[in-house]
Amino acid sequence: MDVTIQHPWFKRALGPFYPSRLFDQFFGEGLFEYDLLPFLSSTISPYYRQSLFRTVLDSGISELMTHMWFVMHQPHAGNPKNNPIKVRSDRDKFVIFLDVKHFSPEDLTVKVLEDFVEIHGKHNERQDDHGYISREFHRRYRLPSNVDQSALSCSLSADGMLTFSGPKVQSGLDAGHSERAIPVSREEKPSSAPSS
């Protein structure tokens, strides 16, 4: 059985010209006449034509506009203080703030590989309000060349904000590049991540 993979904005981008099948599984959109009988309309009568208005409605434009409206009206859209990731590189310190509120320190792995820090989080399937869910993410950030890799630290605040930080050294000193794991410590107080 072949599976059609498409971007969700353009599920019906070509309207009636798109070779749609009932098994494409566009749940929640309703069925259109060409979903049930794609070739029947032209085989019954050669004079049958679908209305232009119906073609425009089915073409995906209305879906695109609806999707854009929902994206623009989400509370986090365009609001930098609700951004879950923040990377800051000051003169004397490099800091990464990452929102990982669905993970415990045991679910997180932080490693330094040469000039990169890799943060991986995974928890097995567990029950939440809507059913069962499992989550996994993998982030990779390039460390500035002057970060002292022997003094890197990582902590998880009570509100689920992971803070990875490391001091910078003067340009004449060697920062040291090796692979090592960074333990994640738990803090009892909420994060003091900047809101801008």
Swiss-Prot record:
At which residues is N-acetylmethionine found? 1
Per UniProt, the ranges with Basic and acidic residues bias are 176-190
Q: Which residues are glycosylated?
A: 185
Which post-translational modifications are recorded for this protein? Acetylation at Lys-93 may increase chaperone activity.
Modification Deamidated glutamine, positions: 6, 50, 170
- The main location is cytoplasm
Q: Name one Pfam family in it.
A: Crystallin
Q: Which residues bind Zn(2+) 1?
A: 123, 125
* One GO cellular component term: protein-containing complex
The protein's job, in short, is: Contributes to the transparency and refractive index of the lens. Acts as a chaperone, preventing aggregation of various proteins under a wide range of stress conditions. Required for the correct formation of lens intermediate filaments as part of a complex composed of BFSP1, BFSP2 and CRYAA.
The biological process GO terms on file are: actin filament organization; apoptotic process involved in morphogenesis; embryonic camera-type eye morphogenesis; lens fiber cell morphogenesis; microtubule-based process; mitochondrion organization; negative regulation of apoptotic process; negative regulation of gene expression
Sequence positions bearing N6-acetyllysine: 93, 122
The alphabetized UniProt keywords are: Acetylation, Chaperone, Cytoplasm, Eye lens protein, Glycoprotein, Metal-binding, Methylation, Nucleus, Phosphoprotein, Zinc
Q: Where is the sHSP domain?
A: 76-185
Tell me the protein's name. Answer: Alpha-crystallin A chain
Look up and give the organism this protein is from.
Answer: Mesocricetus auratus (Golden hamster)
Location in or out of the cell: Cytoplasm; Nucleus
Q: Which residues carry this modification: Deamidated asparagine?
A: 124, 146
